């Protein structure tokens, strides 16, 4: 029997809002629109699997 190691293929991202420079964590495969908690700008939109990130990615969290 072959055992397959599954890696987590989705990650959390720390992004910076281009308007107010607030940093927050978003899921790479977000299924809903993610807005900045400070100014309300859209940071990520769902796009058939992976989200379309509209902010600067600061770090990939493990």
Curated annotation (Swiss-Prot):
Binding-site list for Zn(2+): 17, 20, 36, 39
Taxonomic source organism: Methanoculleus marisnigri (strain ATCC 35101 / DSM 1498 / JR1)
Protein name per UniProt: Small ribosomal subunit protein eS27
Cofactor dependency: Zn(2+)
Subunit field text: Part of the 30S ribosomal subunit.
GO (cellular component) term, any one: ribonucleoprotein complex
Any one Pfam family match given in the protein's UniProt record, by short name: Ribosomal_S27e
PANTHER family registered for this protein in UniProt: 40S RIBOSOMAL PROTEIN S27
Zinc-finger as UniProt keyword: yes
Transmembrane parts of this sequence: none
InterPro entries: Ribosomal_eS27, Ribosomal_eS27_Zn-bd_dom_sf, Ribosomal_zn-bd
Note on cofactor: Binds 1 zinc ion per subunit.
NCBIfam families the record matches: PRK00415.1
Top-rank taxon, per record: Archaea
Zinc finger (C4-type) stretch: 17-39
One GO-annotated biological process of the protein: translation
GO molecular function, one term: zinc ion binding
UniProt family annotation: Belongs to the eukaryotic ribosomal protein eS27 family.
Protein keywords: Metal-binding, Ribonucleoprotein, Ribosomal protein, Zinc, Zinc-finger
């Amino acid at each position: 029997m072959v055992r397959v190691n599954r890696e987590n293929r989705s990650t959390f991202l720390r992004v910076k809002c281009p308007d107010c420079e607030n940093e927050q964590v978003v899921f790479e495969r977000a299924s809903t629109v993610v807005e900045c908690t400070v100014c309300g700008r859209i940071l990520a939109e769902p796009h058939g699997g992976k989200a379309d990130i509209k902010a600067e990615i600061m770090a990939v969290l493990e």
